[in-house]
């Protein structure tokens, strides 16, 4: 082959090669079609100085004529690629060497990394490509790769790593060190066929103009004896054409390398000369800094694109800035209200070094970022500290949007009424200081003097509740009251109905605090899940007055179903004539109206609670009763005591009642007003503190809780007994079979048939 090359390059016009059919005769030796195909591929892809592409006219003539004269320099390069194969396993090294030679490579085998490094230091070997194993004794493949990339001369040699361990950590480590590809064992033949492309890429990136490549201005030389003849054999026109093709192919290959590291001609090749190497290399690329990365191949290839196409990210960056302004507008409108720390928009806006824009307008957007951040902070702070003008609007808005958890203060809330006793100033001051965290629906907690209620939601002992009892609660007040109230926890028998004065104060009967059943530990608890009786109790100083909100003012009728969207309690059932009827039924109003606000909470569907009652069977006896001056109540089945009904009544929606501490209790009748599903009980405290209504304590939370525990214990004992009996039967059966098996004779581990007498004896023993 060498003689043919020398003769062909000295006298190209006379010395030719005759081709016969698909094979080519070279000095009497025939080349295989596979080698011819590989050489044709090399001729089309290798840069100038190696060969020139064949002319299409000659190809047509070759098809027409069996014998055609082909110039040797028109054919593919004379020299072959020399591959240094580094593999410590002998059999693998021999197999891969044979495959490489079959793919027309020259192979220099090496047993370990030190031997390979000695071969590389010998410049007479002229190694074009290194194919090395990752794990090797003495000097590993990664160590060899580091030595190659740090060497002054050998750093231009492409290094391909191969290993049977294809973990991402190993692959990424090799590629970040400067490897151009990673092959997973077992290696396929088509992967070895495409190894020349790495050499072509390295030569291609270094043979371009200096302005594009940045650092590689000299061409990749293949030091061999035949290189002089090769470089001088092409014509000037061919060289110019190749230069143009090189520039076009350079842009194409750069685009592919930026994406997946393979170009169109690679076929099955999956090259790893990609952005991952650039990202994890110790010296990262940036458009402002020259690319002098000795250990990264793709840095040489990607750098021109980062300079030429640096403006491609401008639309994206501007779009991102526009999106930031839109988010700021949304924040000002209240769509994205932040209670905690605001988002760090600078971290979101930060881009990678490759996506840094050179547009000054984008930098201007960057300077505006802290200002927008502070704007969002102030908006959030103003939203949190914004005083309300109407307390009723505040409460109803919180009730309508229970998902909104903003902190709202009522420091500047106007005084709702002038009818305020002088002795309540201390309560007013303590209530004004309360934040909305203390006045929220989900946490009612009042801090004040001993006469005030300490409302803490005690969520203990929730296991006996149904899934239907935990619903949203709507609280509203009449005529601008602070309107919080209502419902006591289902296991508190001594809880008091809340009363809101017109100046936003919450009070309760002080005597009720002395009656504790020990179920929750606190005398007054608010439960969001249960419904509330509209009950009014007076403070200890004014407890001698009889108050009926329905008889006092017609606009304050109580209703079992309180609409969520309304701010005041509507008269859903009863009109003014019903109020007069209630007054005629024996309500004595002897006190001027200084309490006009009742606590309303949203009542849910009654059939839910009936279903709860039938499932839990928590109240064995249900007594019929209602309180005096009942406005709009239909059939009342729960025993109300001082404005409270048992939480485990038919509806399952009312808080636990008193156990009869306040004097007389008598059943009374109430007009039936056409809504059988709504049941409301108003308990009124008269001058003597007597509670109107039936005072049976059948709905006691402790009794019901104990009943539920008893039911569970009984069911558990029954289950355990059944399991014990079942297991006992299994145990007896197992033991009898075991005893029979031990008695049966065996020969070599196999049972043998017994005689009839022995069988009869075994059966007698079983009996």
Curated annotation (Swiss-Prot):
<dbReference type="InterPro" id="IPR045279">
    <property type="entry name" value="ARR-like"/>
</dbReference>
<dbReference type="InterPro" id="IPR011006">
    <property type="entry name" value="CheY-like_superfamily"/>
</dbReference>
<feature type="compositionally biased region" description="Polar residues">
    <location>
        <begin position="263"/>
        <end position="272"/>
    </location>
</feature>
<dbReference type="Pfam" id="PF06203">
    <property type="entry name" value="CCT"/>
</dbReference>
<dbReference type="Pfam" id="PF00072">
    <property type="entry name" value="Response_reg"/>
</dbReference>
<feature type="region of interest" description="Disordered">
    <location>
        <begin position="476"/>
        <end position="546"/>
    </location>
</feature>
<protein>
    <recommendedName>
        <fullName>Two-component response regulator-like PRR73</fullName>
    </recommendedName>
</protein>
<dbReference type="GO" id="GO:0000160">
    <property type="term" value="P:phosphorelay signal transduction system"/>
</dbReference>
<feature type="compositionally biased region" description="Polar residues">
    <location>
        <begin position="532"/>
        <end position="543"/>
    </location>
</feature>
<feature type="region of interest" description="Disordered">
    <location>
        <begin position="205"/>
        <end position="272"/>
    </location>
</feature>
<keyword id="KW-0805">Transcription regulation</keyword>
<feature type="domain" description="CCT">
    <location>
        <begin position="712"/>
        <end position="754"/>
    </location>
</feature>
<feature type="compositionally biased region" description="Low complexity">
    <location>
        <begin position="518"/>
        <end position="531"/>
    </location>
</feature>
<feature type="compositionally biased region" description="Polar residues">
    <location>
        <begin position="488"/>
        <end position="497"/>
    </location>
</feature>
<dbReference type="InterPro" id="IPR001789">
    <property type="entry name" value="Sig_transdc_resp-reg_receiver"/>
</dbReference>
<comment type="function">
    <text>Controls photoperiodic flowering response. Seems to be one of the component of the circadian clock. Expression of several members of the ARR-like family is controlled by circadian rhythm. The particular coordinated sequential expression of PRR73, PRR37, PRR95, PRR59 and PPR1 result to circadian waves that may be at the basis of the endogenous circadian clock.</text>
</comment>
<feature type="region of interest" description="Disordered">
    <location>
        <begin position="1"/>
        <end position="64"/>
    </location>
</feature>
<feature type="compositionally biased region" description="Low complexity">
    <location>
        <begin position="205"/>
        <end position="214"/>
    </location>
</feature>
<dbReference type="InterPro" id="IPR010402">
    <property type="entry name" value="CCT_domain"/>
</dbReference>
<dbReference type="GO" id="GO:0048511">
    <property type="term" value="P:rhythmic process"/>
</dbReference>
<feature type="compositionally biased region" description="Acidic residues">
    <location>
        <begin position="238"/>
        <end position="252"/>
    </location>
</feature>
<dbReference type="GO" id="GO:0009736">
    <property type="term" value="P:cytokinin-activated signaling pathway"/>
</dbReference>
<feature type="region of interest" description="Disordered">
    <location>
        <begin position="727"/>
        <end position="767"/>
    </location>
</feature>
<keyword id="KW-0090">Biological rhythms</keyword>
<feature type="compositionally biased region" description="Polar residues">
    <location>
        <begin position="343"/>
        <end position="361"/>
    </location>
</feature>
<keyword id="KW-0902">Two-component regulatory system</keyword>
<feature type="region of interest" description="Disordered">
    <location>
        <begin position="312"/>
        <end position="388"/>
    </location>
</feature>
<feature type="compositionally biased region" description="Basic residues">
    <location>
        <begin position="727"/>
        <end position="738"/>
    </location>
</feature>
<feature type="region of interest" description="Disordered">
    <location>
        <begin position="646"/>
        <end position="701"/>
    </location>
</feature>
<dbReference type="GO" id="GO:0005634">
    <property type="term" value="C:nucleus"/>
</dbReference>
<feature type="compositionally biased region" description="Gly residues">
    <location>
        <begin position="689"/>
        <end position="700"/>
    </location>
</feature>
<feature type="domain" description="Response regulatory">
    <location>
        <begin position="82"/>
        <end position="200"/>
    </location>
</feature>
<keyword id="KW-0539">Nucleus</keyword>
<comment type="similarity">
    <text>Belongs to the ARR-like family.</text>
</comment>
<keyword id="KW-0804">Transcription</keyword>
């Amino acid at each position: 082959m060498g003689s043919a090359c020398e003769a062909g390059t000295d006298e190209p016009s006379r010395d030719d090669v005759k081709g016969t059919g698909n094979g080519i005769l070279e000095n009497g030796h025939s080349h295989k079609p596979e080698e011819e195909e590989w050489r044709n591929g090399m001729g089309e892809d290798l840069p100038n100085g190696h060969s020139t592409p064949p002319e299409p006219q000659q190809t047509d003539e070759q098809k027409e004529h069996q014998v055609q004269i082909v110039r040797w320099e028109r054919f593919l390069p004379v020299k072959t690629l020399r591959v240094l194969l580094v593999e410590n396993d002998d059999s693998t090294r021999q197999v891969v060497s044979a495959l490489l030679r079959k793919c027309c490579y020259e192979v220099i085998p090496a047993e370990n990394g030190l031997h390979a490094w000695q071969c590389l230091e010998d410049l007479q070997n002229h190694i074009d490509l290194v194919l090395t194993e990752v794990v090797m004794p003495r000097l590993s493949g990664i160590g060899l790769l580091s030595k190659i990339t740090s060497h002054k001369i050998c750093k231009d040699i492409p290094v391909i790593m191969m290993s049977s361990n294809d973990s991402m950590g190993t692959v990424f480590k090799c590629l970040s060190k400067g490897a151009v590809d990673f092959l997973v064992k077992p290696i396929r033949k088509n992967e070895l066929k495409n190894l020349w492309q790495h050499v072509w890429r390295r030569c291609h990136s270094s043979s371009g103009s200096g302005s594009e490549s940045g650092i590689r201005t000299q061409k990749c030389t293949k030091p061999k004896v035949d290189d002089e003849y090769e470089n001088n054999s092409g014509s000037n026109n061919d060289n110019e054409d190749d230069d143009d093709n090189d520039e076009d192919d350079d842009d194409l290959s750069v685009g592919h390398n930026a994406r997946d590291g393979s170009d169109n001609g690679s076929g099955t090749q999956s090259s790893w000369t990609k952005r991952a190497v650039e990202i994890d290399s110790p010296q990262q690329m940036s458009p402002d800094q020259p690319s002098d990365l000795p250990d990264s191949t793709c840095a040489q290839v990607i750098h021109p694109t980062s300079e030429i196409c640096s403006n491609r990210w401008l639309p994206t960056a501007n779009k991102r800035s526009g999106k930031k302004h839109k988010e700021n507008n949304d924040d000002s409108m209240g769509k994205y209200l932040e209670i905690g720390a605001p988002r760090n928009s600078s971290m979101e806006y930060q881009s990678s070094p490759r996506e840094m824009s050179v547009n000054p307008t984008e930098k201007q957007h960057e300077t505006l970022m802290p200002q927008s951040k502070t704007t969002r902070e102030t908006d959030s702070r103003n939203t949190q500290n914004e005083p309300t003008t109407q307390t009723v609007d505040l409460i109803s808005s919180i009730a309508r949007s229970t998902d909104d958890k903003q902190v709202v203060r009522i420091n500047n809330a106007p005084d709702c009424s002038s009818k305020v006793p002088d002795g309540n100033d201390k309560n007013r001051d303590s209530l004004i200081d309360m934040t909305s965290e203390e006045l929220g629906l989900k946490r009612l907690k009042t801090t004040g003097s001993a006469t005030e209620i300490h409302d803490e939601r005690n969520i203990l002992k929730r296991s006996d509740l149904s899934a239907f009892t935990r619903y949203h609660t709507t609280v509203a007040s009449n005529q601008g009251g602070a309107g919080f109230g209502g419902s006591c926890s289902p296991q508190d028998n001594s809880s008091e109905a809340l009363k809101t004065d017109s100046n936003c104060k919450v009070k309760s009967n002080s005597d009720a605090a002395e009656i504790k059943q020990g179920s929750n530990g606190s005398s007054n608890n608010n439960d969001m899940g249960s419904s509330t009786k509209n009950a009014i109790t007076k403070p200890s100083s004014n407890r001698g007055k009889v108050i009926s909100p329905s008889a006092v003012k017609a606009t304050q009728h109580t209703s079992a179903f309180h609409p969520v969207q309304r701010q005041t309690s509507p008269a859903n059932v009863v009109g003014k004539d019903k109020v007069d009827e209630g007054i005629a039924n024996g309500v004595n109003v002897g006190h001027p109206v200084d309490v006009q606000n009742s606590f309303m909470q949203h009542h849910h569907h009654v059939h839910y609670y009936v279903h709860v009652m039938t499932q839990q069977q928590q109240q064995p006896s249900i007594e019929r009763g209602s309180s005096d001056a009942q406005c709009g109540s239909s059939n009342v089945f729960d025993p109300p005591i001082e404005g409270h009904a048992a939480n485990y009544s038919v509806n399952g929606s009312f808080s636990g009642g008193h156990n009869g501490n306040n004097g007389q209790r008598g059943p009374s009748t109430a007009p039936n007003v056409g809504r059988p599903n709504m049941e409301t009980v108003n308990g009124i405290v008269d001058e003597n503190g007597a509670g109107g209504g039936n005072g049976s304590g059948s709905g006691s939370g402790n009794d019901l809780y104990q009943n539920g525990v008893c039911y569970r214990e009984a069911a558990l004992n029954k289950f355990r007994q059944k399991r014990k009996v079942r297991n006992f039967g299994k145990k007896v059966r197992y033991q009898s079979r075991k005893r029979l098996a031990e008695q049966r004779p065996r020969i070599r581990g196999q049972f043998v048939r017994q005689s009839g007498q022995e069988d009869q004896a075994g059966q007698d023993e079983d009996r």
